[in-house]
Regions:
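GST-like domain detector, emphasizing the conserved glutathione-binding G-site
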Residues: 1-253
Length: 253
């Protein structure tokens, strides 16, 4: 029952943001090195950055920094100074370090799409307000750090920002300060719409060729988020509840 209510409130959270962070570009090429994002899942500004990452279909390495976090605090201060706050982006491909959603999103769209920030994810008053509402609906999820065992290697999470099923997983990763490679699988065509078990199309599902979705289907036989890979335990998991149970069992203290 709790998990069902958790997903319902996650749906409301995505609805408050008009489901931005669902669609993804078909053409963005992944850079040689993934950008690093110091992130708090519940931060209104961080949400706008993650929406931009989904729209660009850009993969990043996430260093979670919830309130009271200490695991990546030294690295964050080393990059940005003692008063640096999230979101904070380090892009090794262009040798830039940026703080705040406005500066980060401007860089991401200019660097990886040669365009300006779309209005619906700009840091205007309306977007920040609806992003705050989306956080409130989640009952301040992922706002406080929880004790955890640190993995030797970052985990891998296939997700897209507005996914109601992926959000609780990202929140738990954030609470436990578990670093992870975020593989964004934004929806690129009408056939991608809807949950994996009931897509809004007729016939066999075919992703856009030569994309991450096509590669995932070829390798795993299914395109579904959240999809977690833990290279430390040689584990692959679908279904948000199973992933949450796994994270609690292996990493929570």
């Amino acid at each position: 029952m709790f998990h069902r209510l958790n997903i319902i409130s996650s749906v409301v959270s995505s609805t408050l943001r008009s489901w931005h962070g669902s669609a993804g570009s078909k053409s963005v090429k992944q850079p040689p090195q993934p950008p690093i994002l110091f992130d708090n899942e519940n931060s209104p500004e961080c949400r706008l950055v993650r929406e931009a990452l989904t729209e660009l279909n850009l993969d990043v390495l996430i260093y979670p920094c919830p309130e009271g976090a200490d695991r990546f605090a030294a690295q964050l201060q080393q990059y940005g100074g003692s008063n640096t706050s999230v979101p904070f982006l380090v892009d090794p491909n262009s040798h830039v370090k940026l703080e705040g959603a406005e500066a980060i999103n401007a860089h991401l769209f200019q660097q990886y799409k040669q365009s300006s920030i779309p209005k619906h994810i700009d840091t205007n008053t309306l977007n920040l307000f609806t992003s705050r509402l989306a956080s409130i609906v989640r009952l301040r999820g992922a706002i406080r750090a929880k004790p955890s065992r640190e993995p030797q290697k970052p985990l891998i999470l296939y997700s897209f920002e507005s996914s109601p099923y992926s959000r609780p997983v990202r929140e738990r990763l954030c609470e436990l300060q578990l670093p992870y490679h975020l593989i964004n699988l934004g929806k690129q065509q009408f056939a991608d719409m809807g949950p994996a078990s009931f897509r809004f199309h007729l016939g066999e599902y075919h992703p856009v060729p030569n994309t991450k979705r096509a590669k995932l289907l070829a390798e795993k036989g299914r395109v579904q988020v959240p999809f977690l890979i833990d290279p430390n335990q040689s584990i692959e998991l679908l279904e948000s509840k199973d992933i949450l149970d796994y994270l609690n069992k292996i990493y929570a203290m």
